[in-house]
Amino acid sequence: SARKLVPGERIGLVELTGAITDPEPVNRQLRHFRDVEKVPAILLRIDSPGGYVGASQEIYRQVELIRQRGIKVIASMGNVAASGAYYVAIAADTIMANPGTITGSIGVIAEFPQADTLLRKVGLAFNIVKSGRYKDTGSPTRPMRGDEQELLQSVVDDTYLQFREAVGKARNIPQARLDSLTQGQVFTGRMAKAFGLVDTLGNYDDALRLAKRMAGLSDGAKVIRAPSAEKSLFQRLLGNVNDLWHASSWSVSYRLP
């Protein structure tokens, strides 16, 4: 039976939406609920295709730190929670997905545009001055050498191994069985549950009820959000410039292709 509402009962709601490029907006909310509101539980609503490796790991670690303080964290997957977003989800106490949620995509991708042929056609050439053999690895102005390909593959392989190890540990999946689940393929929520990648199936309201129950709260406990940090026009413009810069430079990502 549902407990009666106790005045002051609250649960924190944190939303992770879109590509994961900057961890700070999400981590700021997590810290707020830990240090200011001191809530007993956080519902982490995820609708993201993944993103940068470092950013995903930053949020993953912050969720771990939140749980170490005794706060329950329930990950609720929306339309998509794949790759880096799945990495974040496995840090939670439990994961709930919709049957049709697109999740999984456990793997790493690094893409390097190559424009040397086009540049030659328009008569544009670059003089490169660098400090070491590999400093311009991934440059779009020339083809990639074989040793550079091997170097970058080693970076991708190690990053993938970190992801794989985290999944195996968090989901208690034997390494042998991980092979078939971590080739970058996507799964529906229902498939993911059958494979042990998520715990239960349900929507946002189901996850909210579960979070309240896990924290020992009544069904009427209030859902609260952290105050948003308003950015100035200059900060927003600077953020747009940074996004363009990241888009034009190479990075290793946990994301859908």
Feature names for model-found ranges:
Residues 1-81, 94-98, 111-257:
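N-terminal organellar transit peptides
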Residues 55-56, 85-88, 107-108:
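Short, conserved acidic/polar surface loops in the N-terminal third of protein domains
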Residues 80-83, 102-106:
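Short gly/pro/ser/thr-enriched loop/turn and capping motifs at secondary-structure boundaries
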Residues 88-89, 192:
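Hydrophobic/aromatic residues within transmembrane alpha-helices
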